[in-house]
């Protein structure tokens, strides 16, 4: 099996053609397209950009809220000189499931909307001709998939997505599509692990190939080769190594080759950063030095393109994070586009990488009442759907770690977001996931999950598996909001005193906290939703953080306003952003800039 999640690279032995652009598009509400032959000829004149979500491009609500099957179609040309190579199609992501057809022949099926997949089409394509590429996608939700939800049928027969999560269920081909020509024998994967020495660094590596020929690995600093080794496993010894660090990212070029005599059979290039990351004595240590995390939970979300990859937006986001003094973000609530990790590698940002395990709670109302402990809840991990959910969860976790394990920016894995984890089935569900993450990751990064507001130190059955505890807390907003901030602060301290008793030397970070603010809303005296109240809340919350030495990070919710399912508690989306959806600062951005640019990197470093 030649499955590979390596990022597409053009080299002396590999060829790439990008297939992004305007494709043809059609909804298929009756799911009749396969039987009607749409894989060979899509009967539609609609055009659709790739990558992008389709939802916000239309002007009618039925199209925006469409739930069910939908089709994309384009054509691609295969050069005659590619004959004799393996021809592979590679999708960055299709939300949430996809069936892929080439010239009417089904070549791939994939479940999961946030990770890449590929299809080998060597024996199906026609060389020196145009070929038809069709994708049948589906955006329905269920309790066995990640993220979790359900699909309802309205009185008029239309389906509608009912997510258990608080972000909009954007759908489409969201990331780049590549046509690749690869050598028959090739590099399928590689991994690295780092050790710092008195004279530099050592890089232990493992290379996976699909053939018998020998492998060499070289490391370059610019045009200078600084280390080399041979074999599918080995060690690169780097003298006077330049380390990758926060906002001081240094990247080396890694070159992996397969040789047959004097010929190079395959060549794969990547950029890596030499760094170590560990937890010791209740602190996060980057290259052996303490680092206090400060930054954001985010979303892949923007006007018009929805969740589709948009490089200008990516660039703007990183410039804003640098301006405000952030050093970290969580990929809430799913793995992001690979290009975002590459940018983090280059800019020196730390990433907590999160699998799309969100919506793992249920309430008779919605996510918000469940978050407050209102409504009837049942254990989410004691249902008939749990075995299938766990299987899909393991598959997504495996793909995320396989894809992202070599990024220096990735410092930790988040295995779930806000699961209902106080019931008896929690431990049986959590244990194999945490064991799998440890087994798959050669760097043994710390593992965590974000703890729901109703999961407390004495009731959470999952926190014992985490290498560090991550709390989502809203004292002063969802709990005791408004004029009673003093009560919110007292309740917050009470809970924190409880966590102090169960951490057993582990650090704790906040992966969510914040309030909604309608940009431009000012009130004197303050009221909820105003800029003044948002700042008062943040000052109170930060004072609580600073009171506890074991608090080692703060990732505010959210970087920018983002879209959600419409409802009476959401005014055209979630407004907790420190920046607007158009990436302009709210008043709170200046509060964070003042705090984060003055906090030392090793804030709260002392620990005896």
Predicted ranges, named:
Residues 1-343, 347-351, 396, 411-412, ...:
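Secreted/periplasmic carbohydrate-active enzymes, especially glycoside hydrolases
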Residues 204-206, 318-320, 328-595, 604-605:
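Substrate-binding/catalytic cleft of secreted carbohydrate-active enzymes
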